[in-house]
């Protein structure tokens, strides 16, 4: 595929505001730095009318909802909408508890999201489809995942990304599948959360071309995973470090040569 946005990230160094979970914060911040973006990891509700105004994109990740997180997410999302920056929702484990479901319901009702990214179980839950999720893991189900992505995108007027062995990107009118990646991704906690942050960096420099930016973000990230996993089998610790190295080493030429997409 043609790489449009990676070079822009390195040139512009966009500031990405992350309200993320305690498991993912360090990995997401380092991943953004490796890619060429700048992370800002603030969840203090008292700052949420200011921080989005100096940022180029916002990530809302519900992985470990504690204290005033929901209030902070709602305020940050509304401020981001006011200033017109892209907003990414990562609805971690949305189907696991009633509190998570209600949090996501309220977020979707009060904040306009640019991208909703999650695993199959999370996006199926948002679409109202039957799915046997396992906590925050994807679980199993029989639904047509392309149809799920399209349904979520159409319902919320956004781009939807279902990540898994095959990644699916849809904006409700166009849908693509990505066939890069590695089985080691699910072995490293927060690898999906980092993907959401990476998507935000690409969206930040996309000038409104959200489908193509999400597509390139996912291709770039999964190629980095492929390259990091070379010669590794069960060495998940080495994979995590190598993934950061490969994000830093990514080039537009690598994306063009290695991207495997069906549109």
From Swiss-Prot:
Pathway(s) it belongs to: Cofactor biosynthesis; thiamine diphosphate biosynthesis; 4-methyl-5-(2-phosphoethyl)-thiazole from 5-(2-hydroxyethyl)-4-methylthiazole: step 1/1
InterPro entries named in the record: Hyethyz_kinase (IPR000417), Ribokinase-like (IPR029056)
Positions with a binding annotation for ATP: 117, 163
Listed cofactors: Mg(2+)
Family per record: Belongs to the Thz kinase family.
Designated gene of the protein: thiM
Species of origin: Haemophilus influenzae (strain PittEE)
Keyword Kinase: yes
Pfam families in UniProt: HK (PF02110)
Gene Ontology molecular function terms on file: ATP binding; hydroxyethylthiazole kinase activity; magnesium ion binding
UniProt-listed Enzyme Commission number(s): 2.7.1.50
Protein name listed in UniProt: Hydroxyethylthiazole kinase
């Amino acid at each position: 595929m043609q790489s449009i946005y990676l070079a822009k990230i390195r040139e512009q160094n966009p500031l990405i505001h992350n309200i993320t979970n305690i498991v993912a914060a360090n990995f997401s911040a380092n991943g953004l730095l490796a890619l060429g973006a700048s992370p800002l990891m603030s969840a203090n509700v008292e700052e949420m009318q200011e921080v989005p105004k100096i940022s180029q994109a916002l990530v809302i990740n519900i992985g470990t909802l504690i204290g005033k997180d929901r209030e902070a997410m709602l305020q940050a999302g509304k401020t981001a909408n006011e200033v017109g920056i892209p907003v990414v929702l990562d609805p971690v484990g949305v189907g696991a508890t009633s509190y998570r479901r209600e949090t996501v319901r309220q977020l979707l009702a009060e904040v306009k999201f640019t991208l909703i990214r999650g695993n199959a179980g999370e996006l199926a839950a948002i679409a109202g489809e039957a799915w046997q999720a396992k906590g925050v893991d994807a679980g199993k189900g029989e639904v047509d995942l392309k149809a799920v992505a399209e349904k979520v995108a159409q319902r919320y007027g956004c781009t939807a990304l279902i990540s898994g062995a095959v990644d699916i990107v849809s904006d409700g009118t166009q849908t693509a599948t990505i066939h890069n990646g590695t089985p080691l991704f699910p072995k490293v906690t927060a690898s999906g959360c980092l993907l959401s942050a990476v998507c935000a960096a690409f969206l930040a420099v996309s000038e409104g071309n959200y489908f193509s930016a999400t597509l390139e973000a996912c291709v770039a990230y999964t190629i980095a995973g492929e390259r990091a996993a070379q010669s590794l089998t069960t060495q998940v610790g080495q994979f995590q470090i190598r993934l950061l190295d490969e994000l830093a080493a990514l080039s537009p030429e690598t994306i063009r040569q290695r991207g495997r997409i069906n549109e």
